[in-house]
């Protein structure tokens, strides 16, 4: 799980290559293994998450054997939440990451160690932004079940990662978990993340990634393509959506290339950490 850093120079070269290729196919993008028009992808992805919203959390448990919980704890640990922070969790509709950030901020032990006063605590705002209202509704219901329906620290916002409604330099932190591979233009989402963060703000992305160990990769591919779609059909009654989710991972840039894209968005101190041999990776960076 060693951290790896990336240079801006490599990022520029890779981004230029990607831009050249993109210019040849400027009106096409990937939806899983399919090539679709850019204007169609958002609707297709929206349909996927509308279909899976009600079973999204339980499927995460089943598909990962519960490991996604540990991965998200790792993500939040790297964020180091603090009282009074303004944080944006993008593609976070069901609230899984936001609730962990909330719990970290409001932890009695953490507050005692940091000598936090109540006034600072009340200034905390965690914005949960998702383009899909069905996913947000699941999150709001979960908040109600936790007794947080009217909590002022949690704000639910329907919005697009590529065109955020938040002010420049307004956020202390930005997280996106298992979401950025579903946007049509990753570069735009990264640019928006950079725009809304304050100087010194932290960017953190948890995403399914590329396994680097050959033998493990073969087993992982077998599990992904033969087991996960069947689980989707059995548990969620939706094979096609989970087939897309599996395929979308393979179309997502490898760890080094994605790190370079983050650097080219303007971020500094770009690093990534592979978990479970690269099944997932956490990319982190700072806006200086």
Curated annotation (Swiss-Prot):
Record carries keyword Isomerase: no
Catalytic activity, EC: 2.1.1.201
Reactions catalysed according to its record: a 2-methoxy-6-(all-trans-polyprenyl)benzene-1,4-diol + S-adenosyl-L-methionine = a 5-methoxy-2-methyl-3-(all-trans-polyprenyl)benzene-1,4-diol + S-adenosyl-L-homocysteine + H(+)
Subcellular localization, as worded in the UniProt entry: Mitochondrion inner membrane
InterPro entries on file: SAM-dependent_MTases_sf, UbiE/COQ5_MeTrFase, UbiE/COQ5_MeTrFase_CS
GO cellular component: extrinsic component of mitochondrial inner membrane; mitochondrion
Keyword entries, A-Z: Membrane, Methyltransferase, Mitochondrion, Mitochondrion inner membrane, S-adenosyl-L-methionine, Transferase, Transit peptide, Ubiquinone biosynthesis
Residues involved in S-adenosyl-L-methionine binding: 94, 130, 160-161
Protein name in the entry: 2-methoxy-6-polyprenyl-1,4-benzoquinol methylase, mitochondrial
Signal peptide: none
A Pfam short name: Ubie_methyltran
Topological relation to the membrane, as annotated: Peripheral membrane protein
BP GO terms, sorted: methylation
HAMAP family assigned: MenG_UbiE_methyltr
Function (record text): Methyltransferase required for the conversion of 2-polyprenyl-6-methoxy-1,4-benzoquinol (DDMQH2) to 2-polyprenyl-3-methyl-6-methoxy-1,4-benzoquinol (DMQH2).
EC category name: transferase
Gene that produces this protein: COQ5
The family this protein is said to belong to: Belongs to the class I-like SAM-binding methyltransferase superfamily. MenG/UbiE family.
Extent of the transit peptide: 1-27
Molecular function per GO: 2-methoxy-6-polyprenyl-1,4-benzoquinol methyltransferase activity
Pathway assigned to this chain's UniProt record: Cofactor biosynthesis; ubiquinone biosynthesis
Organism this protein belongs to: Arabidopsis thaliana (Mouse-ear cress)
Chief location bin: mitochondrion
